[in-house]
């Protein structure tokens, strides 16, 4: 059984409010306006495992919360059930009182956290696109 591909026209609209930069991350260390959640492994977050990219220091952004993206995924690659996702976020003290932004090593797996957050909260996720690949250069 093959699916028929139907041509369509899609107009993408850029929304810069869903992306933050390094300056905003640094400001947040002081003003704590949003929770910054890191999708990397716990060992990388804690600086116990070297970064795969040469030239990056180990560690994490001050005041950020570690939530390895793998915790949200079943063995078959699907997301865990909504109630499980909520429980995991709650266990990590990620709440709805503050806005959220997500980062990872390169800006890719942070979107897994962002989508999971969107599923459980109905809010659009905000991503630090530079992620640790940018932040870890300092």
Mark where each language-model region is:
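Rhodanese-like catalytic fold shared by cysteine-dependent sulfurtransferases
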Residues: 1-35, 39-138
